[in-house]
A protein has these predicted regions:
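Feature captures hydrophobic
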Residues: 1-136
């Protein structure tokens, strides 16, 4: 499945919902998060996850309007998201190193969910995926 495709997003949501550790870590999370891959000469793409108290209520490819309405928006070049999904970089380290930009939402608001964010990307790595041809 192509990363951030309809099928991949649905599979990511299903994997999140099947994981009790994620449910516990995200028990107080309310609101959508959008992850956007942009730069490196690749087409802008991303995913929107609707998270509510440890449950993924839906996930789909992101559209531009999602970046305005989501509680949190994280952007990074495709090569960085690839590192994250392959487990070579945590989202928090990516933000701290300036590789991932918190385009919307406050870092202090996200800090209680570091464990949930780490599990989100770890679980994303369990979804069979291929990366777009224009990703480095």
């Amino acid at each position: 499945m192509l990363v951030f495709s309809v099928d991949w997003c649905a599979a990511w949501c299903a994997v999140l919902n099947a994981d009790s550790a994620f449910a516990e870590a995200a028990a107080t999370w309310e609101g959508a998060i959008v992850v956007v891959a942009d730069g490196d000469g690749a087409a802008r793409t991303g995913a929107r996850l609707d998270l509510h108290r440890g449950v993924c209520r839906g996930a789909r490819p992101a559209v531009p309007a999602d970046e305005r309405t989501a509680r949190y928006v994280l952007t990074a070049p495709p090569a960085v998201w690839k590192e994250v999904m392959e487990g070579r970089l945590t989202p928090l380290m990516g933000v701290m190193l300036g590789k991932i930009r918190l385009a919307k939402g406050g870092l202090m608001d996200l800090l209680p969910y570091v464990g949930a964010a780490k599990l989100m990307v770890e679980l994303a790595g369990r979804v069979p995926a291929t990366f777009p041809a224009d990703w480095p």
